């Protein structure tokens, strides 16, 4: 198993949002396969945000964006190669908003994680999969734009035979196996970290406003794993208390 996901999921990957059902879909996976983006909980579902599209982009909104990213402190420490150095709020922001990141996928208000369908593992289907393992320190990061940004959708009736770059300084609503996410392109130029929350052992959220609070939180990892059902409840709580961007889409 990849060390990248060591503290995120169980030993077996049980869901593939990037699985290919038709040959034509292969090009869509390739279109984003080499993109540079910060890993998060969405990586559990093999979501690879695309940097190219074969469809025309239609402008649907121009507004400020607020979106969420779930990950673990281990994931960030490992990717930054911090070793024994302490993880700070500044390091978390620099990880997600590194200028080398071409795209950042955000969970928004109309991201419906109930669309997750667990993959069969042997003869068993784990209907309540582990999202964050016991002993991990998951965090919720809230990002917002510094100013209004253009939000696009793909016109599925305008398919081309060639893929073209989506471009910088814009957002694109995208769907991966039924899960809507908002991809923000060149996030370092338009986004900022607004808040960080930790998870209590009662499956509630607590705001981490200082590096000291972040350090104390990391010393008290989860005593029990957070499974899908509990995570869905947490996500709904987040949506009710944090005004995430809502972009209604038609299936």
UniProtKB/Swiss-Prot annotation:
Positions of transmembrane segments: none
Organism, scientific name: Variola virus (isolate Human/India/Ind3/1967) (VARV)
Induction: Expressed in the late phase of the viral replicative cycle.
A Gene Ontology molecular function term of the record: structural molecule activity
Protein's cellular compartments: Virion; Host cytoplasm
Domain of life (superkingdom): Viruses
Keyword annotations of the record: Host cytoplasm, Late protein, Virion
Pfam families: Pox_VP8_L4R
Family designation: Belongs to the orthopoxvirus OPG098 family.
InterPro entries for the chain: VP8_pox_nuc-bd (IPR007586)
Name this protein carries in UniProt: Core protein VP8
Protein purpose: Major core structural protein.
Transmembrane helix among keywords: no
Residues under site feature: Cleavage: 18-19, 32-33
């Amino acid at each position: 198993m990849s060390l990248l996901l060591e503290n995120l999921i169980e030993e077996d990957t049980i869901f593939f949002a990037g699985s290919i059902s038709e040959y034509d879909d292969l090009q869509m996976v390739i279109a984003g396969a080499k993109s540079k983006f910060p890993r998060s909980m969405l990586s559990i579902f093999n979501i690879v945000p695309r940097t190219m599209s074969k469809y025309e982009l239609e402008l649907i909104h121009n507004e400020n964006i607020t979106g969420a990213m779930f990950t673990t402190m281990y994931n960030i420490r490992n990717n930054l190669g911090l070793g024994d150095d302490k993880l700070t709020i500044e390091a978390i922001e620099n990880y997600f908003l590194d200028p080398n990141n071409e795209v950042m996928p955000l969970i928004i208000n109309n991201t419906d994680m109930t669309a997750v369908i667990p993959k069969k593992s042997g003869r068993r289907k784990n209907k309540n999969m582990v999202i964050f393992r016991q002993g991990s320190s998951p965090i919720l990061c809230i990002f917002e734009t510094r100013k209004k940004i253009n939000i696009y959708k793909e016109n599925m009736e305008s398919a081309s035979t060639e893929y073209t770059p989506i471009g910088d300084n814009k957002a694109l609503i995208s769907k991966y196996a039924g899960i809507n996410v908002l991809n923000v392109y060149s996030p370092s130029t338009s986004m900022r970290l607004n808040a960080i929350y930790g998870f209590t052992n009662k499956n509630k959220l607590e705001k981490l406003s200082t590096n000291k609070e972040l350090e104390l939180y990391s010393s008290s990892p989860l005593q029990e794993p957070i499974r899908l059902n509990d995570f869905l409840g947490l996500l709904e709580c987040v949506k009710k208390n944090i005004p995430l961007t809502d972009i209604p889409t038609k299936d």
